[in-house]
Amino acid sequence: MANLRKTHPLLKIANDALVDLPAPSNISIWWNFGSLLGLCLAIQLLTGLFLAMHYTADIATAFSSVAHICRDVNFGWLIRNMHANGASFFFICIYLHIGRGLYYGSYMFKETWNVGVVLLLLVMMTAFVGYVLPWGQMSFWGATVITNLLSAVPYVGNTLVQWIWGGFSVDNATLTRFFAFHFLLPFVIAAATLLHLLFLHETGSNNPVGLNPNADKIPFHPYFTYKDLLGFIVLFLALASLALFSPNYLGDPDNFTPANPLVTPPHIKPEWYFLFAYAILRSIPNKLGGVLALLASILILMLVPILHTSKHRSLTFRPFSQIIFWTLVADVAILTWIGGMPVEDPYIIIGQIASALYFLIFLVFFPLSGWLENKLLGLS
């Protein structure tokens, strides 16, 4: 009798994705982040579901309902801390996953890559609306500042902003719809993740040398199930340590003050994982220009496969492109730092230079170095 996992219509899908999947034998630890993102999504869905059971999406009670969760609900403090810090780990994994894709040329799987960029946008949107829910000062003013950016849209801008607000300012209607979006979007993300995997399994995984690995493949289970399990343990230990020992380390102290439309916090800034994009937004002294740069900073990832000029797929054997890649990593770190700084003298110009460099690396330096390396290696 044939094995049930290979014949049952549902189990067969899981088997082909998690057990008998042929995987390149040489994929490194950098290939762990896909499954880690799946784990992050599962943690966020579970903790979020339990938080939603006790949270009230009303401006009169939202802040105190979060306090109630932390004080009175059994392990509510833990669920809330795991959820808030889980978002940070989600973004750490996403950025490492994207960095891996850029370094090893995984973007040559165009469908997988583009679904991935859409996933990034969905996760960013979910995190933004989620940050508004505790209804602290930074929640309120963050929502006000970021939704206000839509008023830069020509002709329909102001109407659009009022439509999203459900009134003439960020108010109860805004909070309730943001809660609805924050509940719904993770399920959309889960669906898009399946699409991401579907496209990936059409081609099979890339590998560190960027060559066709078909001659040397091994089953996903047991080799990579155990390798992923190690990653799960490390991620879970790190998340638990942060949530238990310093749960507020990455948060903003202003969010411990209930939202007050009459008092503006001295520095309005998003969570750390949006700071690089926020720095790019602020570096352009024009509202519409800033919004377009903000969008471009993410959507530029979709251009990467089109601008690939090298005959080599990965950067493993391309020293010039490696230097440019690590310059990009340093540049994003600088942008993250600048995004959290006040808008004053040295920071403004540093942010503008870093923003210009960010776009130049993608649009000019990567294609040029690929072309140059082809010439030097006689591959033209």
UniProtKB/Swiss-Prot annotation:
Compartments where located = Mitochondrion inner membrane
Q: Which UniProt keyword terms apply here?
A: Electron transport, Heme, Iron, Membrane, Metal-binding, Mitochondrion, Mitochondrion inner membrane, Respiratory chain, Transmembrane, Transmembrane helix, Transport, Ubiquinone
Cofactor remark: Binds 2 heme b groups non-covalently.
What is the membrane topology listed in the Swiss-Prot or TrEMBL record?
Multi-pass membrane protein
Q: Where does heme b b566 bind?
A: 97, 196
Q: Name one GO cellular component term.
A: mitochondrial inner membrane
- Needed cofactors: heme b
Give me the segments passing through the membrane: 33-53, 77-98, 113-133, 178-198, 226-246, 288-308, 320-340, 347-367
Q: Chief subcellular site?
A: mitochondrion
**Transport recorded as keyword:** yes
Q: Name one GO molecular function term.
A: metal ion binding
InterPro entries (UniProt xref): Cyt_b/b6_C (IPR005798), Cyt_b/b6_C_sf (IPR036150), Cyt_b/b6_N (IPR005797), Cytb/b6-like_sf (IPR027387), Cytochrome_b (IPR030689), Cytochrome_b_C_euk/bac (IPR048260), Cytochrome_b_N_euk/bac (IPR048259), Di-haem_cyt_TM (IPR016174)
UniProt: heme b b562 binding residues = 83, 182
Q: Which Gene3D superfamilies match?
A: Cytochrome Bc1 Complex, Chain C (1.20.810.10)
- Name the positions where a ubiquinone binds: 201
Gene Ontology BP terms: mitochondrial electron transport, ubiquinol to cytochrome c
Asked if Cell membrane is a keyword of the record, the answer is: no
Its biological purpose: Component of the ubiquinol-cytochrome c reductase complex (complex III or cytochrome b-c1 complex) that is part of the mitochondrial respiratory chain. The b-c1 complex mediates electron transfer from ubiquinol to cytochrome c. Contributes to the generation of a proton gradient across the mitochondrial membrane that is then used for ATP synthesis.
- Quaternary structure and partners: The cytochrome bc1 complex contains 3 respiratory subunits (MT-CYB, CYC1 and UQCRFS1), 2 core proteins (UQCRC1 and UQCRC2) and probably 6 low-molecular weight proteins.
Q: Which family does it belong to?
A: Belongs to the cytochrome b family.
Q: What else is known?
A: Heme 1 (or BL or b562) is low-potential and absorbs at about 562 nm, and heme 2 (or BH or b566) is high-potential and absorbs at about 566 nm.
Specify the protein name.
Answer: Cytochrome b
Protein source organism = Apogon semilineatus (Half-lined cardinal)
Classification from the root reads: Eukaryota, Metazoa, Chordata, Craniata, Vertebrata
User: Its gene?
Assistant: mt-cyb
